Amino acid sequence: ATEIRIGAMTTLSDLETAIAPHHPSFAAMIRRYASVQVRNAATIGGNIANGSPIGDGPPALIALGATLHLRHGDTRRSLALEDFFIDYGKQDRAAGEFVEAITIPKQTDTLRCYKLSKRFDQDISAVC
């Protein structure tokens, strides 16, 4: 396979483990998200769907060329993650539509992520 498919309900902790062999820098940044307790419960789909302009996940995923897969009943559509974010607090998501999955290219060593913050975790935003 040339891409990695990540279900929207994948916790940040599980994502860190799964992504490390392919994108170690992204995995290292995930360790800086929130706290261990939050990473064990929070999902990557929720991180994206929330649409927060201070979220750490979307900048790294956009830099990786991620595709977002949305669903409403039996209707599915895909779009580049960068096209999902329209404006501050506004996403390209229709009523009843939810994030089903994210796919990213499987290539390795193409991204460097660094989180600049005063604290190791529970601080905001990253540079990718």
Name these PLM-found stretches.
Residues 1-128:
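C-terminal structural segment of proteins
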